Amino acid sequence: MAKIKARDLRGKKKEELLKQLDDLKVELSQLRVAKVTGGAASKLSKIRVVRKSIARVLTVINQTQKENLRKFYKGKKYKPLDLRPKKTRAMRRRLNKHEENLKTKKQQRKERLYPLRKYAVKA
């Protein structure tokens, strides 16, 4: 089997990807048997290509799965931890914009009664 490109895999459905994954795993086991029995050098060098292909297929499966989960949870109140933005612990606990801008009644009254003075500079 030739080297598989990730862009070719992205258009396929999940069932097709799983079928291809099984085929690659079967091929890898056959190549490993050939390695033990003393197979040709071309088969030995093919083991690396097949392993990388398996990794590519799994990567595409996982990425599409995560993408679908992101679409599903978009706009929902709660999201799984791995879909939330990765921030530091302190940043997660910080007040949000709305909470930062809230003012007490006393502070609102003070600002209303004593507005900021504006000065005109005489040239």
From Swiss-Prot:
Gene behind the chain: RPL35
Location of N6-acetyllysine modifications: 19, 43
CDD domains: Ribosomal_L29_HIP
Subcellular location: Cytoplasm
Chain spans, region Disordered: 86-123
Keywords assigned by UniProt, alphabetized: Acetylation, Cytoplasm, Diamond-Blackfan anemia, Disease variant, Isopeptide bond, Phosphoprotein, Ribonucleoprotein, Ribosomal protein, Ubl conjugation
Family, similarity comment: Belongs to the universal ribosomal protein uL29 family.
Residue(s) of cross-link: Glycyl lysine isopeptide (Lys-Gly) (interchain with G-Cter in SUMO2): 25
Record organism: Homo sapiens (Human)
Keyword Acetylation assigned: yes
SUPFAM superfamilies: Ribosomal protein L29 (L29p) (SSF46561)
Protein name: Large ribosomal subunit protein uL29
Described function: Component of the large ribosomal subunit. The ribosome is a large ribonucleoprotein complex responsible for the synthesis of proteins in the cell.
